Amino acid sequence: MSIQFKTIRELREMLDKKVISSEELTGETHKLAEDLKDLNCFVTMNKDVSIEKSKLIDQADKSASVLSGIPLAQKDLFCTEGLRTTCSSKILSNFIPPYTATAVMKLESAGSITTVSYTHLTLPTKRIV
């Protein structure tokens, strides 16, 4: 079953009807990210932590939030405590933030699962005359 083009609403229905578990959904998300590795669009994979969180969500059977158990990829400019955040910059290539950005905190407190951070490419800064 491919989840690649499913909406959050469709995934939520699948979770509610127990067609798929959060752990299976998170695993499928990591498989898709691995399949797209050649595109070089993901900076940091959060596989172990995200699989563990999905197992906890499955055990707790939390469906109070629409995002509960839904895997998300976040842009590589939002800090997540303990997850390498580079902003696609060489100077930040090994930066592990000691805090989590408010936006990420709100998503995670709603039950979403951060699976990967994807590239943040800036526009060229060369001046065009």
Label every model-predicted segment.
Residues 48-55, 111-112:
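Long amphipathic alpha-helix in the N-terminal Rossmann-like dinucleotide-binding domain
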Residues 66-106, 110:
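Enzymes and membrane/adaptor proteins characterized by extended Gly/Ser/Thr/Asp/Glu-rich
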Residues 118-125:
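Conserved small/polar residues in nucleotide/adenosyl-binding loops
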Residues 1-45, 51:
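An N-terminal boundary/leader segment
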